[in-house]
Amino acid sequence: MTHVLPVPTSYSAEATSIYVSGSNVYVSGFYHTSTGPVVPCYWLNGNRYDLPCSTGGGEALSIDVSTGSIIIAGYYYNGSIYVACYWSNGIKYDLPLVGSYNTYANSLSISPEGDILIAGFYGTSSTTACYWDNGTKIDRNVTGIQPVAYAIYAAGTGVYTAGRYGTTKTIGYYWSDSEKDLSPPNGGYSTDAITILVQ
């Protein structure tokens, strides 16, 4: 059964991540307005809740629930640069800036110990893949150019990230203790890794 998530009349929207706990369904996303910025939000059992950000707008890209707290990762535009952030129960927390670079938070995972792990990247003309562990930035030293991290998963004591690098041709990768490239079978096509699960 398809469930249409409500947004203001005639606006387009995107659902970016989903989390299910018992009978509760949490969905992160954002919607466009006719004249204003993009609005980050989440839906709980079909009810929409807008998330605070600057007047430049933002996107909510990943959602998780831990010990009753609704935690959402994303980013927003502060008028000068894009700023990676997360919301916990509707309160926005900025992740540390890296100089004057844009920063983006794409995915989050809560570790068994309750640590908030967020994957993303930073940079302007070039990028660096990274993740934040409770706000502390840790770079992923990916070998290729323009790397980004799209996904993260905490398993045991390990932190796994997945993403891609490259420009004209992209190569998907995942990283645990070292980089593992996910090259296409015939070597001719681009690949992206956009989510990761460890069992």
Residue ranges and their predicted role:
Residues 1-199:
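Residue-level hotspots at or immediately adjacent to binding/recognition sites across diverse folds
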